[in-house]
Amino acid sequence: MKKKNNHFMNTLKSFGSALLVIAILIAAYGIYHAPTSDASQLKAELEQNERELAKEEATPANPPENTPAGTTAATHSAATGVPDISQSSISVIGDSVFLGAAPAFKKLYKNAVIDAKVSRQVVQALDIVKNMDKKGKLGDTVIIALGTNGNFNSATGQKLIDYLGPDRTIYWIDAYGRNLPVQRDVNNTIRRVAKANNNVHVIAWSKEGPKHPDWFYQDGIHLNITGQKKFAKFVRKNMITE
């Protein structure tokens, strides 16, 4: 009888172990399959967007539409104290977050010049804007969409703003990621730089992003198709109402 009980208990243990292994395999599939799928789709999107932006970079910059001769956003702002985005040439310096949203933003501002790359950091931005300026592609309105990939100090940010000058309207989109370690430090630095410069305005993506987890891919940083469109509209809304 004892042997039968032992056999029964061993059978239960074996069955329980098998169920545990199956449960672990199912959980592992759920954890790893979705992010891999997301990563593949995101990679394809970013590569496609980079190719499209590279084509545009090879062509001369278009002047902003419906802009009266001799009128720029800078002169309008100086006269009224309010940036006029409708009469502005827009340039964007961004990382992979903005690269993903580039097509959606171009639908809102088709003449915007976007220079966005994967893994880009703020410390690289000064050389980028100098190159854009040399090519005549640095607009009256500049959007800085950097900070996700690493911290920087106020001096680095100020050098960038100094080069862009006081006559440009500058929007700096702050950083957000569901588990982004540098977010707090980066955003504090962005706000310090903005506070020191009247023409720099912060677009608080870090406050809007957390409200919409369904806009993001699995990594909680990059945006899916829906999120890209919403992000572009959020940026536009903040540029208009700033």
State the predicted function of each range.
Residues K2-S89, K135-L138, R236, E242:
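N-terminal secretory targeting modules
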Residues F15-I22, S40, A175-S206:
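Substrate-gating cap/lid alpha-helix
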Residues P83-T156, G177-R184:
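Conserved SGNH/GDSL esterase-like catalytic core that processes O-acyl groups on lipids
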Residues Q87-S88, K110-A112, K137-V142, G165-Y171, ...:
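Loop/turn elements at helix/coil->beta-strand transitions in domains of secreted/extracellular proteins
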Residues S91, L99, P103, K107, ...:
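Solvent-exposed, polar/charged alpha-helical surfaces in well-ordered, non-transmembrane soluble domains
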Residues I93, D115-K117, I173, I203-E208:
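Conserved beta-strand termini and adjacent loop/short-helix elements that scaffold enzyme active sites
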Residues G150-N153, I161-D162, I170-W172:
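Internal catalytic-core helix/loop-beta-alpha segment
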Residues N187-E242:
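Catalytic His-Asp segment of secreted/periplasmic serine-dependent ester chemistry enzymes
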